[in-house]
Structures are given as C-alpha cells and as structure tokens.
Amino acid sequence: MSSYFVNSFCGRYPNGPDYQLHNYGDHSSVSEQFRDSASMHSGRYGYGYNGMDLSVGRSGSGHFGSGERARSYAAGATTAPAEPRYSQPATSTHSPPPDPLPCSAVAPSPGSDSHHGGKNSLGNSSGASANAGSTHISSREGVGTASGAEEDAPASSEQASAQSEPSPAPPAQPQIYPWMRKLHISHDNIGGPEGKRARTAYTRYQTLELEKEFHFNRYLTRRRRIEIAHALCLSERQIKIWFQNRRMKWKKDNKLKSMSMAAAGGAFRP
C-alpha cells in the first residue's frame, strides 16, 4: 500500500531543484532571489529544506518528461519558465513544457517593470518589518534579562541575610501542671509523682460482680483475686482495696445494727 502511494506521488511532485516556480505574470519579471526553486523552498520552510524528495521508483519517462525538462533547464539556466497550465491553458498538463525564450528576445514592458518594482517594494517592506520585529523582540529580551537580574539580586541578598542570622533555638517543652494530667489511664502508676492516689470509678457491671463475690466470701484468696481482676479488667490492687472498703462498711453497718438492737432490747427490759 505504501509503495502504491509513493509511486503515484513521484510524477506529480518532482524533486526540490526541479520543482517549477508558479508564476502568474511574465517569466522575465521574476526576481533573482526566486529564480532558484531550491533556495525559495529553503527560505520558505527554513533550515535547508530542498523540497519533497519522492524519487523512489521513478522511471526515465515520467508524466512531465523529466529528461527533456532537465535539458531545457541546462540550456536556459538564467530563465525561469512558467508552468504550462497557467501560460497555455489550452494544452494538456501531461505534455512537456515549451522551450524557454532567451532573456534578450523578450522586451520588458512597463507593466512588468511596475510589477517587478511592486515585488521589490513588498520585499523591502517585509524585510524592514522583520528587522523591526527582531529589534523589538531583542529589546524585550533585554528588558526581560534586566528584570531577571534585578529579581535575582534581592533573592541573593535575602539568602545572604538568612544565612547571616543565627538559627532560632528549638522551643522548650511546655510545662505540664498536675491539673493537666489525665486520670484513670493506667492502673500501674496510680499514686503518681505527687503521691496522691486517684479515685477509681467502677461501672455498674463491675460493682454488681464485686457485690456478688463479697456476698459469698468476704475474704478473697490470691488466685480468686487474679481471676476477678482478669474478668472485670481491673488490677489486683483495686480488687483488694474495694474488698477492704466493703468489709469496713459491712462492719460499721453491723455495729450500728447491733447497737440499735441492744438499745432497743434494754429499753424493753422489765
């Protein structure tokens, strides 16, 4: 498929040096800078462009007669013939171009001179505008570089001042007061640095289980204390203290009850 397209384009688009310059007026009015088609294409497309090279698989007898065209260009190298499709619309496009006429045989006409002068004036104006644009761009670049240098100077001065200043000392640890500490976090350090033990808040489930255990046995063994501590997520010290307090309360209640009963019995004694 690719070879089909390449072979079909070979005859239609000749090489860069052989490519004809499209001219709508008299061929004698063409400027010197546009006589060489290779230089025209290189100037139009920039950076050494020599046109489209699709000469792969070209035969000696192309659509345009490449051999005859090369000989005609060698004979009249100083002229630039016009393309037959514009100069002779009646002839076929597949026929070879006619032989070019010498420059001396063609008399310059005032119209062609004016056309040539218009082209030169256009070329001069375009060159002047290009020069003005380049100078404007260069001036803008100069302003940009100057502003960049001015911006770099304060930045460098700021860096130097930052390096000269001593680095600030790391902030000290904030002071923690006793009322800022959280309670009931760990049961291992209940006393704390100040020596005051925190009050333990028992849940309803823990209180109910401890009351049941106290109802069956007022004194716990070490093994039973460890089991209750694991079951209620408490420490052995907390279990021990709770049972001590509960026994003291029980004794107080019993003492008051016995004293009240004794007082009541002595009052009713005959």
Curated annotation (Swiss-Prot):
Record's keyword terms, sorted: Developmental protein, DNA-binding, Homeobox, Nucleus, Transcription, Transcription regulation
Known DNA-binding region: 195-254
Cellular localisation: Nucleus
GO molecular function, a single term: RNA polymerase II cis-regulatory region sequence-specific DNA binding
Chain spans, region Disordered: 60-175
Motif (Antp-type hexapeptide): 176-181
Protein role: Sequence-specific transcription factor which is part of a developmental regulatory system that provides cells with specific positional identities on the anterior-posterior axis. Also binds to its own promoter. Binds specifically to the motif 5'-CYYNATTA[TG]Y-3'.
Name of the protein: Homeobox protein Hox-A5
Provenance organism: Lemur catta
